[in-house]
Amino acid sequence: MTKLILIRHGQSVWNAENRFTGWVDVDLSDKGVQEAEKSGQIIKDLNIKIDIFYTSYLKRAIKTLTTILKKNSLDLKFNTAWQLNERHYGSLTGLNKEETKNKIGEVQFKKYRRSWDCLLYTSDAADDQCC
C-alpha cells in the first residue's frame, strides 16, 4: 500500500520571533533542529521505509529533511520544488504577527494568514485589502 507522509519543517528562526516568513530563506532555530531530529527518530522507531522525498527550495525544509535522513542513516537524493515553498506573504514578510494583528484587526489578520485565495501585494500592508 502506498502511503504519503507530510512533515512540516521544524521551527525557523523567524517562527521563534513570531514573524511572517513566507519565502524568506531563514534557517531552523535550535528548537527546529531538535524537532527535525525527533521526527527522524519517530520514523526510525516505526521502521517506516520511504522511497522518494520531496521538499521546497527553502533551507529550513531542506535541513529538516536532511536531518531526518541522517537520523535514519539514509543517503538518498531528494527532489526540490518551488511549488512546495511556504505561501508568499508579500508586504507582511518580516513583520511581527502580533503587532500586525493589533494594527489591522483580528478579522483581516486571519484572512491574511489562512486564506488560500488572498493575494498580498508588495505595497504597504495597510493597502492589502484584497481578501
Predicted segments, located by residue:
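Extreme N-terminal starter segment of soluble prokaryotic enzymes
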Residues: 1-5
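Active-site glycine-centered loops adjacent to acidic/histidine catalytic or metal-binding residues
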Residues: 9
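Glycine-rich N-terminal loop/short-helix segment of MobA-like nucleotidyltransferase
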Residues: 12-26
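Conserved protein kinase catalytic core
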Residues: 15, 88-89, 130
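Short catalytic helix/loop segments, enriched in acidic residues and glycine
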Residues: 24-38
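Phosphate-coordination/substrate-recognition cap region in phosphate-metabolizing enzymes
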Residues: 39-110, 117-119
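Single conserved hydrophobic/aromatic residue that forms the stacking wall/gate
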Residues: 121-131
